[in-house]
Amino acid sequence: DYVQKTHHIFLQLSSEKGVNEGVDFKDEAFAHLRWTTMWWGFAGTDFFIQSQYDDFKDLKIRQLEGGYLRLVSPLFDGEVALGLGAMSEYEQLKEGGGEGFTTRFTNYVSLTEKWFGGKLKMSLTGYYQPKVEDHSDYRMTAVGQVGVNIIGGFSILPSFKYSYDSKPPKGVVVDDLQLKLYMRYHW
């Protein structure tokens, strides 16, 4: 995270590989870069690029580039944000196929809140991404986490991610739930 006045740059990188008795059970990676600028106080823009793969979802590569109009309103000790935008998507599957390039609308609503002087933080975001040329082909994702400050800069963050794809690739389930527990040290 890099924040300066009206600009916020966010980079997230993750890679997960799991092997049990010589057999892979997880192999995925994710990279996301976003630039948010609040031009008019409550209104601004988000621009992003993203790349990912997931061996166990037959996803060789998925690349996104897009942008949003972002509207933000304070809420207690947090905020609620709404994003309305569009993105290009390139998707290639391991077994061939995939849709190649397509365009999707991408919309989100996000809620963040803090309690106990910031020792407990919650974030919840929902995304809805219908294909521009076929609204019956859509993806929905809900992501949430609670950050609990334990001591100093050390926190634990239980989190979840639920994804739904109305028209997934052949052999891939329509929905997926991930539950994780992160530990973070902030200095």
Role assignments for model-derived ranges:
Residues 37, 41-55, 59-89:
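Gram-negative (and chloroplast) outer-membrane scaffold detector with strong preference
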